[in-house]
């Protein structure tokens, strides 16, 4: 183990999705001999099956590598893997805070994309040394000089020394390691000072409680030491320390500059929040890390078990997921249409998909999920402000003074050919254009303010389809703005179905209501009586569709004879249908709730 910090290098890899970040990490591990051939597997650091399958990194991981440089000196390299997706932007910023350098991976066939830029700016905010790497040079469509020029033009980094590499073929890996050793500064920090460490990830281990991934900046961590978390003042005793190389192995101490895991009998992941500062209980540090914030969910949806008996199992599954994911929230809710379930909060759409997929895959649950909604701010006539994440909880129109909805600032990177289609899409989503600048001859950066409610629905999919997959999106929350919003209720035979109600912009309400009714007419099965499907704003019905009734041919047995005989039978049938309608209730199939999600814009 290096005696001084001079031989330690802490770095992370930043890249847009699919630019080859996890593959590069695999090659670095193999090149330094950290992972033996026996354990090697693709995307080594992505532990979750889902991460491998979707090719995305969800949780941060770290690994320590020993590397003998070309000058014969042994170095200790700590790779801190960061999630690349915009939903996890805060986790990325905390992971970057734990490093001194970053490898910027750019795909030689794609060039610079939106999330690459977003992460680079964060890295520059943390004063990291950035090493550009142009990946996938083995592909026939690779354009290395073009990408080099783009890195200089768009990001403003000197790309003359950018390493051309192919993580897949293992080209250029040695050069990357040399650049890390040469360019990334060693960590500063005094091992004797009061302890100061940042938590950049934490997860739950069923045997040891919460495991915290920390980077020590000042002081030393040792077993039996009393530590304190700055944000909530809770105190714990360190039980064990370890490092990943790449499998966890225990160490006796972690000193300034090092990265490792701490187990300290913490029972809840909520206590060890990402971005919090760890310090000594007896002599706390004077300056904890700035920028700590509690991550708030932005998107909500109801999750209900299809079988009522799975309710407890769903609760257990959600509890377990929450142990590992402090940003995920849930609370019980009841719906007259769907029974008992939970209202869950997520960071964004990808986060929502991942949680739902994990519930279905890891816990074998079959679920109904309602349309995603966002948090609205309602000021009532008394002047009170309430936040509402469920359309069903919206107060009656008469009591609302104003309604505000969250807005995002979206940065879209695209090819110049697709600008028209993208501007049209943003316009349709009630977007306001803020900026449009050309980056070279082929790429363009478009900045729009768009309401979050318009983005959560299917904006990302639409963006990909109008740009043939080339556009990339990055967004941050801008704040709340007042809007003319109404609650659209769906009534079936005059009864409102709470799980189908949505909050929409008044201009869109008629259009949306009509489409919903048409969609529901297709999925609600015929009954023995007529079923009326109506869309309403308050007491005003704005659209209606009817599902026709089944009819038995009651006059089949009459041959000839008087018309009054037939009329009597038909009248009797009508009476019966009327009575049925009064007592009958319509069973709404699962497809109906999904239909709400799939209404084409």
Curated annotation (Swiss-Prot):
Residues involved in GTP binding: 18-23, 135-138
Gene Ontology terms for molecular function: GTP binding; GTPase activity; ribosome binding; translation elongation factor activity
Keywords carried by this UniProt record: Cell inner membrane, Cell membrane, GTP-binding, Hydrolase, Membrane, Nucleotide-binding, Protein biosynthesis
Catalytic reaction list: GTP + H2O = GDP + phosphate + H(+)
Domain tr-type G intervals: 6-188
The enzyme's E.C. designation: 3.6.5.n1
A GO BP annotation: positive regulation of translation
Gene3D superfamilies according to UniProt: 3.30.70.240, Elongation factor 4, C-terminal domain, Elongation Factor G (Translational Gtpase), domain 3, P-loop containing nucleotide triphosphate hydrolases, Translation factors
Protein name: Elongation factor 4
Species: Anaeromyxobacter sp. (strain Fw109-5)
């Amino acid at each position: 183990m290096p005696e001084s910090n001079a031989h330690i290098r802490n770095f992370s890899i930043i890249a847009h999705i699919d630019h080859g970040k996890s593959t590069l990490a695999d090659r670095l591990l193999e090149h330094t001999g950290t992972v033996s051939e026996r354990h090697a597997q693709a995307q080594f650091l992505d532990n979750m099956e889902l991460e491998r399958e979707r090719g995305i990194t969800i949780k941060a991981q770290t690994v320590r590598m020993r590397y003998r440089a070309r000058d014969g000196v042994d170095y200790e390299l700590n790779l801190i893997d960061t999630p690349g997706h915009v939903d996890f932007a805060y986790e990325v910023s905390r992971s970057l805070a734990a490093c001194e350098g970053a490898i910027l991976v750019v795909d030689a066939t794609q060039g610079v994309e939106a999330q690459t830029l977003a992460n680079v700016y964060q890295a520059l905010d943390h004063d990291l040394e950035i090493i550009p790497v142009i990946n996938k040079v083995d592909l026939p469509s690779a354009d290395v000089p073009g990408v080099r020029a783009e890195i200089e033009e768009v990001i403003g980094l000197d790309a003359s020394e950018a390493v051309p590499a192919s993580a897949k073929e293992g080209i250029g890996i040695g050069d990357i390691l040399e650049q890390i050793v040469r360019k990334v500064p060693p960590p500063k920090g005094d091992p004797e000072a009061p302890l100061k460490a940042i938590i950049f990830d934490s997860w739950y281990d069923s045997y040891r409680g919460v495991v915290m991934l920390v980077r020590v900046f000042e002081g030393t961590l040792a077993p039996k030491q009393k530590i304190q978390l700055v944000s909530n003042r809770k105190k714990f005793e360190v039980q064990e320390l370890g490092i990943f190389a790449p499998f966890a192995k225990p160490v006796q101490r972690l000193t300034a500059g090092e990265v490792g895991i701490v187990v300290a009998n913490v029972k809840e992941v909520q206590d060890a929040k990402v971005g919090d500062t760890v310090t000594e209980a007896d002599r706390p540090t004077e300056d904890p890390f700035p920028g700590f914030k509690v991550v708030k969910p932005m998107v909500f949806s109801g999750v209900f078990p299809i079988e009522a008996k799975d309710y407890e199992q769903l609760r257990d599954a959600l509890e377990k997921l929450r142990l590992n994911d402090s940003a995920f929230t849930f609370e019980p809710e009841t719906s007259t249409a769907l029974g008992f379930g939970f209202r869950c909060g997520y960071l964004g759409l990808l986060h929502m998909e991942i949680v739902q997929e994990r519930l279905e895959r890891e816990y074998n649950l079959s679920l109904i999920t309602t349309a995603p909604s966002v948090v609205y701010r309602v000021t009532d006539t008394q002047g009170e402000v309430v936040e509402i994440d469920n359309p069903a909880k919206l107060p009656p129109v008469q009591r609302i003074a104003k309604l505000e909805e969250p807005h995002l600032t979206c940065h879209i990177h695209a090819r110049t050919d697709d600008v028209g289609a993208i501007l049209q899409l943003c316009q349709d989503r009630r977007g306001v254009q803020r900026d449009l600048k050309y980056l070279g001859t082929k790429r363009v950066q478009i900045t729009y303010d768009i309401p979050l409610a318009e983005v959560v629905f299917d904006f990302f999919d639409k963006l990909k389809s109008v740009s043939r997959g080339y556009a990339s999106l990055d967004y941050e929350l801008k704040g709340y703005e007042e809007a003319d919003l109404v609650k659209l209720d769906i009534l079936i035979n005059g009864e409102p179905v709470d799980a189908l109600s949505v909050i929409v912009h008044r201009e869109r309400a008629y259009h949306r209501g009509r489409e919903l009714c048409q969609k529901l007419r297709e999925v609600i099965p015929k009954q023995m009586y007529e079923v009326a499907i109506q869309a309403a704003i308050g007491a005003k019905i704005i659209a209606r569709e009817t599902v026709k009734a089944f009819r038995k041919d009651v006059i089949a047995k009459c041959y000839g004879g008087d018309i009054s005989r037939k009329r009597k039978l038909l009248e009797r049938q009508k009476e019966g249908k009327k009575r049925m309608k009064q007592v009958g209730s319509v069973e709404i199939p699962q497809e109906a709730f999904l239909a709400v999600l799939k209404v084409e814009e």
